[in-house]
Amino acid sequence: MAPAMTLSDKEFQKMRNWAIKCLRTIGVETGGSNVQFAVDPVSGRMIIIEMNPRVSRSSALASKATGFPIAKVAAKLAVGYTLDELPNDITGKTLAAYEPTIDYIVTKVPRFDFEKFPSASGHLGVQMQSVGEVMAIGRTFRESLQKAFRSLEVGVDGLEPKWAFEEDPDLIRARSFDLTSLRFATAFRLLKIREAFLSGKTIKEVFEITKIDIWFLNQIKMLSEQDYEETLYQLKSKGFSDAQIARNARTSAEKIRKTRIKENILPSYKLVDTCSAEFEAKTPYCYSTYDYENEIEPIQGKKVIILGGGPNRIGQGIELSLIHISEPTRPERSADGVVW
């Protein structure tokens, strides 16, 4: 996720300095690189676990999350430009030398395809087992986390167990939960953690067996403490879908949707502008959230909407993204705007 919510400023600055020292030691003079760290939350011991002296999937994620075109800037630096010579394409006023700042939360969740490998244990370790990932942006961590799980296309409407769809919410809360099922990391352990909180387990109990940072556990627990007195707007701002709200209200998603529209509870759109709205953005890269202020104006005239293929999976990869990128550039397209 970005920004890193559980790192102290001292740890952040230490990582920054070590990353630069790592690049200098290896001999990377220009171009894109990423350095990954592991931090012991008890002792504070920090080690470098990986360094990629190239543009990678992590670079693509960082570019999407911040709006800063890492690959493009790296290529220009490689041919002799300097950062203070390159304009920021999004603002048109600042330079690439300025570090991007963000006023939102970005969450990445990996996509696994264990169901296609019945013999696989499903336990996660030091080896990469994901076949793709999704990235979601929200004003809060809870909102972006729920949006990310919905985007995985694994049959969930947010951060809740799959079996919750057919059961009474009160029965779920009364269910006894076996904490030992959280001992090992699995593809859907976060869903089981929410199940544990719904069953009445405390943050301390879950932390003792998972060692997941208490900040994250507290965020998931707050999602599990959905109050029936909360307004529809408050629930939507926490990332709950109409279907999730409907199940707890014992009604249909369509009724919730109609009520939202009637009460004018509609998503607004915020800009990813690299500068936390300090300067006007020229490029319409935005995300939806539930807030009273819209930062963009609707496109006038004829529009074309391009639907993505979702997260990578076995049998569906990045080749579909190439088709989506190429399609709007066809000469016969006469739309005034393209919505991705």
Give short role names for the model-derived ranges.
Residues 323-340:
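Single conserved hydrophobic/aromatic residue that forms the stacking wall/gate
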Residues 244-249, 253-294:
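C-terminal amphipathic alpha-helical interaction region
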Residues 314-322, 326:
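Glycine- and acidic-residue-enriched helix-capping/strand-helix junction motifs
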Residues 206, 245-246, 325:
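Short alpha-helical "recognition helix" segments of helix-turn-helix
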Residues 1-231, 236-239, 263, 267-268, ...:
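ATP-dependent carboxylate activation and anion-phosphoryl transfer catalytic cores
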